[in-house]
Amino acid sequence: METVQLRNPPRRQLKKLDEDSLTKQPEEVFDVLEKLGEGSYGSVYKAIHKETGQIVAIKQVPVESDLQEIIKEISIMQQCDSPHVVKYYGSYFKNTDLWIVMEYCGAGSVSDIIRLRNKTLTEDEIATILQSTLKGLEYLHFMRKIHRDIKAGNILLNTEGQAKLADFGVAGQLTDTMAKRNTVIGTPFWMAPEVIQEIGYNCVADIWSLGITAIEMAEGKPPYADIHPMRAIFMIPTNPPPTFRKPELWSDNFTDFVKQCLVKSPEQRATATQLLQHPFVKSAKGVSILRDLINEAMDVKLKRQESQQREVDQDDEENSEEDEMDSGTMVRAVGDEMGTVRVASTMTDGANTMIEHDDTLPSQLGTMVINTEDEEEEGTMKRRDETMQPAKPSFLEYFEQKEKENQINSFGKSVPGPLKNSSDWKIPQDGDYEFLKSWTVEDLQKRLLALDPMMEQEIEEIRQKYQSKRQPILDAIEAKKRRQQNF
């Protein structure tokens, strides 16, 4: 019965979830069909809206902190209405997960398509995708929003070949405001120099990222992808703008387009509106030229799913036979919680969206920067000394934290010193421990003994900080449950 429903067109188009739907449990409004993939921020599922029959994508994100900020950013998403931007329908709070209901793009991301086909895109294909992407950026920038996470993994295609921007602000803000996972390091490969340097940035930061994305689509990965992210942090602001590995393979128009995007000075960088008039984009062909590569990618995906399903069925049979021989009772092996197969990848590039692969370089860098009405006369450029300064990039926070931890650990193990009060101890700057040579053994031993109370004090401070963040979330969960019970 469900199969028949899926084959029929939607009874009416879903524009957004009404208040009645939002007060229900999400399982009453949607049938979850299968798991599409995972990102650093959570899992993505394909689902069907029961009332309209429309297919949607649902991101299930574990919420661990700053719930009010997340809700505020999601409400801003409702302002966006463009055919070149993935639509946001609404959100639910269930247990400790946030369910974000968004438009489903059946072909997946551009990076998914490159990975599945195991080949890069042609200039014609790139031009068509860039044209739609620029229209999406023009809309966002007109709305005075900065995406800050433009890359092939965040450009989705529907089955007709229409490109749409995804994860603008929602996933970016979620990953910025949630508790960070130690295994995740934001990659700076797509980021504009001014964003890395934190010297102030505006909408054209997205244009730099678009130029990097153009190279990514042409060559399969962004510049500097083969080096450590920490090294790239310093190379992007200091080195000349990156270019193609083999410039002779590409047309003058394409080369010039990328050059216009990758101008290090934000003031001299082209805008989305200007780039829509560039010869490379103006000569772009219709979306129909993307249908062949979409069909090819979807065929590969289907064959992999069928192959993996056969393997799962075979494993189930073998496990069942073993169980029957051991106990005389047939026991069917338990599958995953959704009863579906997750597709593995042959290539990884750090894409982080509605994906069918594991990320080796997941991105935490997307952040929507919203300007209030009071700031309109001042423009969108943000400086460090302003009240609403840009959030520190996640990768910088990560590396700074690791550096502090390394300094504390190495100092605590081998170089303690004699201070009467443990609170007076300062971490030596620039690894300068020469002064320890003048201390006596007794002084060094006193310093060592003082470390344990310091550690206990720091642990208690961390516990109190965690509790202060945890309690509002628990209160919000309880309030949400009471509200649902009232209906």
Swiss-Prot record:
Residues 303-312 have a biased composition (Basic and acidic residues). GO terms for cellular component: cytoplasm; nucleus. The modification N-acetylmethionine is found at residue 1. It catalyses: L-seryl-[protein] + ATP = O-phospho-L-seryl-[protein] + ADP + H(+); L-threonyl-[protein] + ATP = O-phospho-L-threonyl-[protein] + ADP + H(+). Its main location: cytoplasm. It is an enzyme of class 2 (transferase). The record marks 326-327, 349-350 as: Cleavage. Its cofactor is Mg(2+). Inhibited by the C-terminal non-catalytic region. Activated by caspase-cleavage. Full activation also requires homodimerization and autophosphorylation of Thr-183. Activated by RASSF1 which acts by preventing its dephosphorylation. The modification Phosphotyrosine is found at residue 433. Residues 433-480 form the SARAH domain. ATP binds at residues 36-44, 59. The keyword Transcription regulation does not apply. Residues 290-310 form a coiled coil. It comes from the Eukaryota. PROSITE patterns: PROTEIN_KINASE_ATP, PROTEIN_KINASE_DOM, SARAH. The modification Phosphothreonine is found at residues 3, 183, 340, 367, 387. This is Serine/threonine-protein kinase 4. The gene is STK4.
